[in-house]
């Protein structure tokens, strides 16, 4: 410990701290080459397909799907309430939110290494061994273990932590988007299965009445026993379907309860399947594939690539000398009352240089591992873009074909209903066999079931398109 001017010591320490520079060894982030077309293939045009109509508040010319809030996308108040509850209560989504908070705090820890750690220390020493007791007092302001970032190691580690934080934030957005889509799909599935229950119950009632009439006619010898048993098979088929769909409704409700994170009151259950439960902003012709860059999973992969690239800079910097500074500025005195008198100033300056000479290949292995991690992250980034392109292309391909299927099935149900009525009249008049009427009933019932399923698939595809284009991460304006 040297005594002298405290001002002189402060200047020496300050100059040493200002020496720190940022000579960065971090390489440039490699360019991703996912090799995807610049535009998605146009969906097939099918006769009878109707274009997807926008929501009432849509402004397709000025606003991209990715910017449409989920409250603007869904028009069913019940569904909006369930989505809001899921975002507040869902445990899996809560984990994603907490991961973001954790990554933010880790970044703050890493960032703190870029500035000196300053602390104040006060000491009193009293000693004596058969002689008069002596006392010594001191008060110091110390900078301990501050690394001069001459080659950017600390900066690279801080940048890596920052990019990891950004990646977690995008992962949270992706989790939110997936949760919203899943809640909407389960809600629609519940509504569709409820329609299937109503259809099966109505069909069962109709067939039971027809079975009773057939039994009466058999008692009078008007029909054979074969007609009776064929009628009974129709009854039991509808009864089995009713039980199956009631079970599916119960499972749908359980799934919705889990996603929402609480009880779903009867008032929030769908009254039935509403084809207008979602609105979708019309996509402009030739939508470019670079909108994938706004998908949260793609952005998360990009930030992970940048984090891995920054780690290469830190691994390279480890090959070079590192300088760590420890210094104090303070006062010392034999008497507490004179601690801050003139001439009591002290300072110390202890630089430490660490020069790696022999590490047994550890530093080179660390660099190789960092490069491998960067290459893995690059491949994952390119893969995320390719997966996103395929998801959007597949969903666009189904948009018009599902609309065409629904339109054809609506015509089929209408025609099958007329055919079933004619078959009933002709059978009761004795002009056709019961087998003809039976086939007409089956055709109508299957067509009605398939129409419900296709309507569900069409609406689910709309939700999927909204999701794969990156929409749903904002709440919206309504």
Please provide the spans of the model-predicted regions.
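Short segments within alpha-helical structural elements
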Residues: 208, 237-266, 315, 411-469
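Periplasmic alpha-helical coiled-coil/stalk elements that build and connect Gram-negative outer-membrane
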Residues: 3, 154, 167-287, 398, ...
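Sec/SRP-type N-terminal targeting helices
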Residues: 94-95, 111, 148-176, 226, ...
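Short, acidic/charged, Gly/Pro-enriched secondary-structure junctions
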Residues: 94-112, 121-125, 306
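Strand-connecting loop/turn motifs
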Residues: 24, 115-117, 149, 251, ...
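Small/polar, glycine/serine/threonine/aspartate-rich low-complexity segments that form flexible
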Residues: 58-61, 65-74, 79, 84, ...
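Terminal intrinsically disordered/low-complexity segments used for targeting and assembly
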Residues: 2-88, 158-162, 246-293, 299, ...
């Amino acid at each position: 410990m040297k005594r002298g001017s405290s001002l002189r010591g402060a200047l020496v320490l300050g100059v040493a701290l200002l020496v720190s520079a940022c000579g960065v060894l971090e390489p440039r982030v490699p360019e991703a080459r996912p090799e995807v077309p610049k535009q998605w293939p146009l969906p097939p045009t099918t006769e009878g397909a109707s274009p997807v109509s926008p929501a009432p508040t849509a402004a397709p010319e000025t606003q991209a799907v990715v910017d449409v809030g989920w409250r603007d996308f869904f028009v069913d108040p019940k569904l909006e309430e369930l989505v809001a509850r899921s975002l507040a209560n869902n445990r899996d989504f809560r984990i994603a939110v907490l991961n973001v908070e954790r990554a933010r705090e880790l970044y703050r820890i890493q960032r703190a290494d870029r500035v000196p750690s300053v602390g104040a220390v006060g000491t009193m020493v009293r000693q004596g061994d058969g002689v008069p007791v002596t006392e010594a007092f001191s008060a110091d302001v110390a900078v301990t273990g501050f690394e001069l970032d001459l080659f950017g190691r600390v900066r690279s580690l801080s940048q890596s932590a920052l990019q990891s934080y950004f990646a977690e934030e995008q992962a949270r957005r992706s989790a939110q988007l997936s949760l919203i889509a899943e809640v909407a799909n389960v809600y629609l599935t519940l509504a569709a299965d409820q329609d299937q229950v109503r259809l099966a119950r109505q069909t069962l009632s109709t067939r039971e009445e027809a079975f009773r009439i057939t039994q009466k006619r058999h008692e009078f010898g008007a029909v054979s026993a074969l007609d009776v048993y064929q009628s009974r098979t129709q009854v039991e088929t509808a009864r089995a379907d009713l039980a199956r769909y009631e079970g599916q409704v119960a499972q749908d409700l359980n799934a919705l309860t889990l996603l929402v994170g609480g009880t779903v009151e009867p008032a929030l259950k769908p009254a039935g399947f509403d084809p207008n439960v979602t609105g979708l902003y019309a996509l402009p012709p030739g939508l470019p594939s670079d909108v994938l860059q706004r998908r949260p999973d793609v952005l998360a992969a990009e930030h992970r690539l940048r984090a891995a690239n920054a780690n290469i800079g830190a691994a390279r910097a480890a090959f070079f000398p590192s300088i760590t500074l420890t210094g104090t500025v303070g006062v010392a005195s034999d008497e507490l009352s004179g601690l801050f008198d003139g001439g009591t100033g002290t300072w110390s300056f202890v630089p430490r240089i660490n020069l790696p000479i022999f590490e047994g290949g550890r530093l080179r292995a660390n660099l190789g591992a960092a490069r491998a991690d960067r290459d893995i992250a690059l491949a994952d980034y390119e893969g995320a873009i390719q997966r996103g392109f395929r998801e959007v292309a597949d969903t666009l391909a189904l948009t018009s074909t599902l609309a065409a299927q629904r339109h054809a099935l609506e015509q089929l149900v209408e025609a099958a209903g007329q055919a079933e009525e004619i078959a009933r009249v002709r059978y009761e008049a004795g002009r056709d066999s019961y087998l003809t009427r039976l086939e007409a009933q089956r055709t109508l019932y299957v067509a009605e079931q398939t129409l419900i399923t296709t309507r569900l698939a069409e609406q689910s595809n709309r939700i999927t398109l909204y999701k794969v284009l990156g929409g749903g991460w904002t709440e919206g304006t309504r």
